[in-house]
Amino acid sequence: MKKIFSFLCMLMAMTAMISCSSSKEEKGTTGTGNAALDNIFERKSVRTYLNKGVEKEKIDLMLRAGMSAPSGRDVRPWEFVVVSDRAKLDSMAAALPYAKMVTQARNAIIVCGDSARSFYWYLDCSAAAQNILLAAESMGLGAVWTAAYPYEDRMEVVRKYTHLPENILPLCVIPFGYPATKEQPKQKYDEKKIHYNQY
């Protein structure tokens, strides 16, 4: 009887483990037990979106996350343009070579930097853009970084439709929304890229 009981206990434990594991796969979590790390590892570029608006509260949180990025000497040279105007989005999508997905998005955030305030604005703004992408991921949204800087033609397109002052330079356009398809994150960890004490 004891053997049967032990066997049943073991069977139940194994079933629970399999169920847990399959639940993690369904959610797409990496299972580190650390929510911040899981979110980083789960981030992926999403280029197709549902025709559904994103709540203002979520957009505000994305912007707040962007402004929480580190910046040299705490200058915070970033500026953000939130675009929801359909004509502007479609015009930029038509003119930017790698931003065609903007036609599907209901919104985009343009991350910009004030070149008059910081020579390294693009470094600080890159950190801000990454925070925005991670915030989107954490809230079940999909987003993708499409570069404007350092390409003069792309920067000019963004400048044209958003009326940026001369000293405000667009780093990237981030279209975002609720994902239309289920994307999987890429496994990017590569031990060969790690060096200790010297290359």
What label would you give each PLM region?
Residues 4-9, 18-199:
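Acidic, surface-exposed loops and disordered segments
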